[in-house]
Structures are given as C-alpha cells and as structure tokens.
Design a protein with these regions (language model features):
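Walker A/P-loop
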Residues: 40-62
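Conserved interdomain hinge at the start of the Helicase C-terminal
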Residues: 62, 173, 179-180, 245-281, ...
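Conserved Walker A/P-loop ATP-binding site and its immediately adjacent core
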Residues: 63, 71-94, 107, 198
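Conserved helicase motor
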Residues: 81, 101-113, 280-284, 303-319, ...
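C-terminal helicase lobe and adjacent C-terminal extensions/tails of nucleic-acid helicase motors
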Residues: 182, 263-273, 279, 284-291, ...
Length: 584
C-alpha cells in the first residue's frame, strides 16, 4: 500500500464540514485512529457509538498501519452482502475504482467448472470488501473454493465491521483462525462495533471457574496490549456520553403487542414526529405492519417497506427516496427488518424496535437523531411484540431477547447504551450459550467441530495414541478435516441466490442467457450481484414447484420469473400481478 492512498484519504477528511457538534467528535475519533496506527501489529478493538464515523476512521487507521508495517492490503469483513455496496462505494469515491474489489459470495456459480475456477475473484487489489460468511468458509468450509482466499489474508490488515454479528457457534473457530493469522501470518486486525462482544480472555473473567477454564482452553482472542483504540474504560464512557443522542424506553405490555396495537402506537408517534422507523424481527411482521399502515390510509408516497426479499438495487432506490423526503422535511414511515441496522446512514426523529438483543437495540438507536440534528434527544421505544416462539427458527434473536429484557430491567432509568450495560448483556449472553461456541455438531455424539479440527479426542482410534505414547512412537493424526468441512455451515439454513428482474436486472438476465464467453459472462454476473436475492430452502422449493426459477444454461446461476417479484415486497413465493419496473 503506497503513501498516495493515505494522502487521498487525508485530503478527503480535511474537506468534511463540521455542521453539528457530533462532527467534531467524529473528527477526534478519526484522529485517535491515526495516532494509534503506529502501534505494534496485533488484534485491536475499535468501540465507537453508532454514527461515530467508524468506517472512514478504521480505514484511516488501517492505511497508516499498513504503511508503517509494510502490509500488502486491507480486507474489510462485513456481516451482510446488503451493505458491501455502500461501504465499498464510499472508499472507492476516495481512493479510486482500481484500488477496490467487492467480493460477494451469493452469485458464485454452484458448478465449479475449470472456467469458473480461473475467472472467480482473486483478492489481488489493495482493498477488498467481503463478508464474514466468505471469511469463515475460506477457513472451515469443505472443498477448495474458499481456500484461495486464505493466503491474501496474511500480511494484511483485517477490519471486522459489526463484529457482534459473528455467529455464536463460530466463536472459538473464528478466534483460533484470527490468532493464527496475527501470530504466524504477519497480519493485524481491528474489531469495529458500538457493541463490543466478549471475545477475549478478559471478557469471561466473571464466569464460574470451571466454565471460564473450558472457554479459555477452546480459544479466545489474544488481544494486543492496550487493545482498545479509543482508550480505556473512563475514556470510552466519556465518548459514549458525549455521543448520546437518544433516550430509550422499554414499553412492555403483558402478553405482548399485537400487530394492530403496535401499528396504532406507531401512528400515534407519527402524529408528533415527522419521521418514524419501526424495526421488527421477521419478514412476516414487517409485511403485516406495512399492510396495517396501508389500511389506516398512511399516504403511499410516505410509506416504505424494507426486507431482504428486495434486491440491493431495489433497497438502494427506496433509501434514496426516503432520504430525499427527509431532507425536504416531508413525512416518512418506514417498516423494516434488521437490515437497516447495519451500515445505513439514515436519521429518523423516532425509532421503534421490536425486543431483540441489546446490541440490535443499540444499532436501531443509531438510526435516530443520528447526527444530533434535532433539539434534545431522540426517542427510541422498545416493544415486546406478539411473536411465535423463536427458539428453534431464530435462536440468536430468542437468546438476545431474554438477556436484553434482563438488562433493561437491571439498568432501568439508566443509559442502556453505556459500555457497562453492554458488557453485562454480553456476559449473560455468552455465559448462557458458552456450550454452543465450539460449533456443536447436530446428531453427533463425537464432540464439536472444534474437536474434530484439534485433538479429536472422541475419535474411535484415540485410545491407540495412548499406547503409542507409552512405546514412544509418534502419535497418529486424528483430525477429521473432511467431515468438518462437510458439516460446516455459517448459516444453519443456507440460502441460494437468484437474480431478480428488477430494473437493470431484467436486461442482465437476458445478457447472461445469451453469453457464452466466460470472461464476459463473469462481467455480467458481477453486475448482477446488486439484483440478486438470497432464498431460504423452503421458499426455494416452493418457487421451483411454481416453475418460477430457471437455470441459465447449466451454469448453476438462476433467475426469477418476473411474476414473482413485486414493487412493494420484492421476491414473493406466490405469484403476483404483472408489473412495470420504474427507476426510482
């Protein structure tokens, strides 16, 4: 990485206006990141409240750190494909297109021909954006598809954005891989979030001794000395207090809020706040609440629905419309799933959040009074909705709800976004789920996936090693690499991607269907990323039965019939009326 990259970023930062007091705080955060860039290599944390400008601040740290230590590239690992585009675009605008690579995983062809292998993305640019799914699959997934991405991770700076979204079952696998990269691969890492999870050894000091010893033995992050870039506890507390822009109220109702009750509460808030955002846990709740607002005659131009059933290009167009209305002080009501919580720069006067994990509540609060533009503090409401049991279908949300409710009660009347409350939440959360963190293998009595990749003590041949040690023979290697690769899935119900006929997506489908030259095909496929939707197995089967999904020329790439994509909800398992697609 050349000094020219640093100079371009410094010039851009110098141009930023300071319209609100928060802009001065963001500048100080970026300055602290620059100051700490000269530190020794290692694993660092960057704990910054939502809206603190951590994307460019972490880039500033990484560029100068890479230049200081002669590192080759910066790799941004982001939780969702839905926010890669905007983060990459922000960096591309500063450094130039030739320096930035976006590597999505959702449209990689399922069939690995030799042409696919030759033309699939290499991480050969100075700055790479990818997902946590890609990172974990490279290390632990079966086959060779992801293995080519391991060596570029060495001698690099890895920035993990919203690290709290790391799946609980992957905690020990992730920690061991990252420790290896830093200790033996010559890399450095920065874990960015407003809600720092307890991934290091010091984070489990409050656990009972037996559980603390087990968790540490399985592997936790070996952080650098003075690892928090923003300083120690007192400095962090002051930063969060200075950036406090909202007041959070837990409005609990016995038996939970029904759709009609929650909808009526939303519209009551809308009468006094010009803009309202309601974030829910499931797509069904989002659709039902949106339809309630329609029935109550909320003007269609002011009402928005967002979910991952809409492709990225579709959501981007909706965000643009919302921002235009907000800038003009026009009314906005938005019903969204959790996708709006990560990396979306939008600011509402009022936010309502369905009860979820405390980290999710904090992220939702980051969409309220984001720039401190409103007099006084913004209002964030947390409601316990009437939902079916989420324990089996969405266990992370279910566990988060339980522990968040506990902390909300314990810290009643206090700022629950303060680091002390968040730390208490994660202590409860990780203690409750500590047995899951080594990736327990379903329907197996032979330990966890971490066991399979380490000493594998449950292996039937393990007893032979005791005999070999007694006779001073080398032990047999017991690792079950192949079985571990087959069993590993970042997402329990892995999705499959389909290109949808929204906007330019329709023309790209036609081009892909008529293109036989591999390089050109991959070019169109890269453009089609923004027009793809990830589909869960049960919905995929229903679409197949309806003849709504078609494969492109035996390539393992699929597209959707336009009768199954709507302007309001995106991809629909049931057929919708034919529609025209307009550029928004």
């Amino acid at each position: 990485l050349a000094s020219g990259h640093c100079n371009k970023l410094e010039a851009k930062l110098a141009q930023f206006e300071r319209r609100y007091p928060i802009d001065e705080i963001r500048r100080q955060i970026a300055d602290d990141c620059l100051q700490r860039a000269a530190d020794a290599q290692g694993i660092y944390t960057l704990t910054v409240p939502t809206g603190g400008g951590k994307t460019l601040a972490s880039l500033r740290h990484a560029l100068h750190h890479a230049q200081t230590h002669g590192l080759e590239r910066i790799i941004y690992i982001i939780p969702y494909t839905s926010i890669i585009d905007q983060n990459a675009e922000a960096v591309r605008d500063i450094l130039g297109d030739e320096w930035v690579l976006e590597h999505h995983s959702n449209l990689d062809p399922e069939k690995q021909t030799w042409q696919n292998k030759l033309l699939s993305e290499n991480w050969n640019k100075p700055i790479v954006f990818t997902t946590m799914v890609q990172f974990l699959d490279a290390w632990f997934g079966g086959g060779t598809r992801g293995a080519r991405h391991i060596h570029p991770m060495a001698n690099s700076v890895l920035i993990f954005d919203e690290i709290q979204t790391l799946p609980v079952k992957c905690v020990h696998l992730f920690c061991n891989a990252l420790n290896w990269l830093v200790q033996f691969g010559g890399s450095s890492a920065v874990l960015c979030t407003a809600t720092q999870p307890l991934l290091s050894a010091c984070g489990v000091d409050e656990f009972p001794e037996d559980k603390r010893a087990l968790v540490k033995a399985r592997g936790l992050l070996q952080l650098a000395s003075n690892a928090e870039i923003m300083g120690k506890n007192q400095a962090l507390d002051k930063l969060f207090a200075d950036l406090s822009r909202v007041e959070i109220k837990f409005n609990e109702k016995a038996g939970g809020w029904s759709v009609d009750e929650a909808g009526a509460f939303l519209l009551t808030q809308f009468q006094t706040a010009l803009s309202c955002l309601f974030i829910v846990n499931t797509k069904k709740w989002a659709k039902d609440l949106y339809q309630y607002c329609q029935q109550q005659n909320v003007p269609s131009e002011a009402l928005f629905h967002l979910s991952t059933n809409q492709c990225a290009a579709h959501r981007k167009a909706l965000f643009a419309r919302m921002k235009q209305r907000l800038e003009k002080k026009l009314p906005v009501v938005c019903i969204s799933t959790q996708l709006i919580e990560a990396g979306v720069d939008i600011s509402m006067a009022c936010v309502i959040r369905a009860l979820g994990g405390l980290d999710s509540i904090a992220q939702a609060a980051g969409r309220c009074n984001r720039h401190g533009e409103n007099a006084g503090k913004g209002r964030v409401w947390v409601l316990n909705l009437q939902e079916p049991s989420l324990a089996k279908v969405l266990p992370d949300i279910d566990a988060g709800q339980q522990q968040a409710e506990r902390v909300l009660r314990e810290f009643a009347g206090q700022d629950i976004l303060q680091p002390k409350a968040m730390r208490q939440y994660f202590e409860y959360y990780f203690y409750q789920r500590s047995d899951e963190m080594a990736y327990a293998v379903k329907n197996s009595a032979s330990g966890s996936l971490l066991d399979w990749l380490s000493d594998n003590g449950y292996n039937n041949y393990a007893a032979k090693n005791d005999q070999r040690r007694q006779t001073k023979q080398y032990p047999l290697l017991m690792h079950s690499f192949k079985s571990a690769g087959r069993a590993f899935q970042v997402i329990d119900a892995p999705t499959r991607a389909v290109i949808v006929p929204y906007g330019e997506g329709k023309a790209l489908i036609a081009k892909l269907c008529g293109e036989y030259e591999p390089k050109a095909f991959y070019g169109y496929l890269n453009q089609a990323q923004r027009f793809s939707v990830n589909v869960f197995p049960n919905v995929w089967e229903k679409l197949i039965e309806s003849n709504a999904i078609h494969e492109i020329a035996d390539t393992g790439v699929y597209y959707l019939n336009e009768r199954h994509y709507s302007e309001e909800y995106g991809l629909a398992a049931d057929e919708v009326a034919p529609m025209d697609f307009y550029d928004l």
